């Protein structure tokens, strides 16, 4: 139950860095950046005596702040022979950060980024100082370009299709009719071949799904291999026992569920983030729990492990004690607040919305307005609601909002939704 607060990359990354929702850190959409003057947990780590570094995907437009060392992709970066911008190369440069001349590294970006992370630990890490390193891969971002050595992986395998891949969206909110993130919206760059003609919607979905998933999983294989390289380095250099290792992403992703790819909406495939943490000194291997965690909790949790107090500007909470003994601190949340701001984005035609998620229910309000945020576009929309009951409908295909049996559930969830919206000081 680890949930993203805004399921799109730059806003989620800003939330992870700051422990704040988008309306507090200023990164509402992909067109916003995290100002170097803004507080973030890397700065707190530095104040606490930690050496800090970030390598790979940054994607927050401005120069990374709070890092003693960085070597990052400009913007989204590229898969093959990526360019990385280092702190040294940025010195004295006044152009927009992503336009900074960087260095070309030969190879696939996943391999390059892992190698640079290992190299930093070998060459730059101060053995007399604790460290915090962020290693951020580009993969498996669209358009899923994998390293050549994985080209035959799953070649003759048919990937099982999700049960709801042919969702008809009956009874659902109107956004399902507007979105252009269905498998049939994939283009030749995504598929890396000419698209077949004269296929029905479902026939195209079946064809596209197999190509999409194999490319995606080949990208994942590269990540798996390179995470292994990093873990091996930590083991071989006596660092594993006393290092907190966090494996996560900036959001979830639709892998054919509802016939979709991408993210942005509140169904579990998009809302839920992978989160695995290894810390042999304190976390029991193989342990799991169902506590509701949000990505705003990452920063205060990491500070907690570093022995640094949570600053007042952070909206998340440390979940260290949950990892240690499985017990939630008194007053731990029983619901999470979500908000997606990028209305009418030109590639996916998604609708702005906010909502609440509990262990059983999701209530979502699609308000459908730009609110003058960067990267939004006017797209007429009549506001509507969805209610999912994940106990009765775990695949989130039925909208129970207008079902009379759920009137009290809706009323209670609306009250809780607006309580959370107010508590987080989201006033728009």
PLM regions and their residue ranges:
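Formylglycine-dependent sulfatase
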Residues: 1-385, 394-428
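Residues forming the ATP-binding cleft of Hanks-type serine/threonine protein kinase domains
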Residues: 391
